[in-house]
Amino acid sequence: MIYCVLSTTPGTFWFPSGFDPKPYHPSADSKLLPLGLITLSACSTRVSATTRWSSFHATDPSLSWLTGSSPWLVILQGQGGSLFCHDVLQGRLYILSHSVSLFLKTGLRHCEAIYRAPLWRDRPLPSLWTCRDPDKAFLPTLLARSARRGLAAFYALWRLHLGSRSELSHPVLEWESTELVLTDWRRGRNEAQRDAPSVAEHFARCRPLLDELCGEGGWLPFAFLSTSPHVWLILTEGGPVLAVDVNDTSVWRIADDLELLRRLGSLLLLSGLRLPLRPPSGSGEAAGEPGYEEEERRGRASTASATAATSTRGPTRPTRVTRKGRVATGGVHLSARPESEEQTDGHHGRQESSDDHQRGGSGRGHRDDGAHRHANDKTEPQQRGEHEERKQTDSGRHEHAQESQVARRDEEETEQGDSERSCGGATQTYGGRGRHDSCPSIPLSVPGPDPRLWVPPPHLLFPSPLPPMTPVDDEPSVRPRCPPGPAEEPPTCRPRPPRPSSDTPLSAVSRPSAPPVPPPSTARVRFFLSSSSSSPSYSPAPLSPPSPVSPSSPRSPFIPPIRSPGLRAKPRVSSGHPAAFPPAPSSAPARSERVTSVPSSASPSASCVGKSQPPAAHTA
């Protein structure tokens, strides 16, 4: 027997460390008033004296067996009189009853924290989910364990035991037992035809509701009640087990998972809190109701009139009436409407009188004409109502036609690249138009090209494969970013000077002009000499123009590549201006000698085809 001690004296409130009762204050948003604390004990004798809250020992008979850090269950009361129980360990709120009088009868029967207590590890509760077949007595345990791994693992085991029958017992009313049949609702005609012949056909009414509640593909109906074939048990992706009544489309939770369902049995299945929810608008059930089309038509008309009233554009006046009776307003053809209802009624009356005049004499025609006029007077309110609804529908259709036409023109102007439009001038319609096509279009700004965005020239996207040298700055982040100048133009292929023979004197050979010597700087220069491969290593600078992008690379040229934090960024120097150094101080006269560069390709003419020839290095 389980006893509870309810402390309602404010002086005896003792909260464990880490527990804050402020969220339960009546001034909070939840509006839950704490009534007291519940201490659970599993002893054979009833606890009569209050326990000292200052010290707890393991041998204390009234020691709570929930957990050592938070041994309390807080009982709360809502505004409507419903009583709730907060499990501090799990952080969950359970509903106990809808009134205090009902709580005095049921007690903590519906408190699921009792059935999850760690005490049952030593003294386990009996399983209330059993199979009729003795050979499948292990099936509920295996299904509960497989559900911990998700719906895929549960489905792999569940589909092998379709058609198995089991029972759910009540924890208090032992004579109450509910039979379950494991089956698939999509194949309900085979397994459950004798019990529920129409379940497979009518279960689709709950699909929109379950998709909205659990997500598409996040639920699986695995069993139904043989005594009530319209009630199905559904396992969700997160673990909670739901019950769905396909007749009134109501949903309620019966357990947190299948492990708790084995201990609760049919407790919450028979006495749970049902939540009748209305299916989403536009579903099959709502569309089949009488008057649904009329309600939808009125809703579309009212939405169209509200959109027209709040529209920023002024009313469009008809310019002309075409031969087919349509009004042309700025390129949008709209149906012509009569100016007033009196003209419409008078027109019908004149047409009927002319028909009667053709049928018989003048006197009888006048009498019939009066009778028809009297009939028209009787049906005039009905015709006026239909005419007003037709006008509202037409106005909604006209408004949508105008919006679509304006959006189409804006998109065409945007595609043509009109320079007069600003960056956010064009608009486009957002949102699909399904069944509820009365939703107003939402104008969105179409982003244009940013003039502040620097677009690199083509020769920087595909530079020469062999840069001669790469300087490394001590502090590359301090140097400001400069726009590309004319110094970064691609080098051209220049013919190589003729090689002098051994008989030609040195004075007759034309010496190349020495490049300008830049002033000495603090930058270090690192040379990359590669004789084996034709493409040396290359690392771009973080503040230089973007790195080259190969045609096969999916990376955008405007996004800098990801570099390893261990490598140091090395800015690139244009290949058109080779770096040189001032001559070293020496007393000997300077003598120049030319070093010919070895081409990377075997063919002498292949170096000038699509590639820039690296200039020869001169040493002073």
From Swiss-Prot:
Where along the chain is composition biased (Low complexity)? Answer: 278-290, 301-319, 501-512, 522-541, 597-607
- Region Disordered: what ranges? 278-620
Q: What family is reported?
A: Belongs to the herpesviridae US22 family.
Q: Which domain of life is it from?
A: Viruses
Please list the residue ranges that the record marks as compositionally biased, kind Pro residues.
446-470, 481-500, 542-551
Give the protein name, as stated in the record.
Uncharacterized protein DR2
**From start to end residue, where is composition biased (Basic and acidic residues)?**
336-411
Species in which this protein is naturally found: Human herpesvirus 6A (strain Uganda-1102) (HHV-6 variant A)
